[in-house]
């Protein structure tokens, strides 16, 4: 635990020193949509934690520079502890980002009377925190697998591929009326609670797989 505490302190110091611009951009985007759009509470509540979930993986790139790994592993830190700390750090930061997003969404509702942030929406936001943890886990796995500039390029490419696949599947379903009706009928037969549980389980599964994969990647790394 001593090694994890030291790594957490390092990453928090690095994040707050390098993340000032990130918070400025997040605040600007949130303010812009609050002033210009009609329905922004949900967007803000999702946008802020999603950006932070992706950004937490950037601490890995700083560890790679100037033989940082060699220095870290000369301390009471091994590869398993290093990966474990990255996931703990991403969990803390993503949870904090989620809380900030919900608070900002609540402020938006107070500022703009036409906004609605009902209990159903809050329940949905509780589910999204698991999704963001899965995103953070995937980000860490990619950054560990692809070092330096490769990691910076692979991550947006992977996101684009996922969106492209989702768009292709959505277009195919929309064009196939029979399949669309079958899917809608199946969804109508499933309650909201079952869908929520399925999303949580799927997110936790993705997070766990990314953790196991990150452990294997780190074990094979050569410095």
Kindly label every feature range from the protein language model:
Residues 1-67, 85-223:
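Hydrophobic alpha-helical transmembrane segments of membrane proteins
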Residues 74-79:
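Short helix-to-coil transition segments within interhelical loops
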Residues 81-83:
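Alpha-helix N-cap/helix-start motif at helix boundaries, enriched for small hydrophobics
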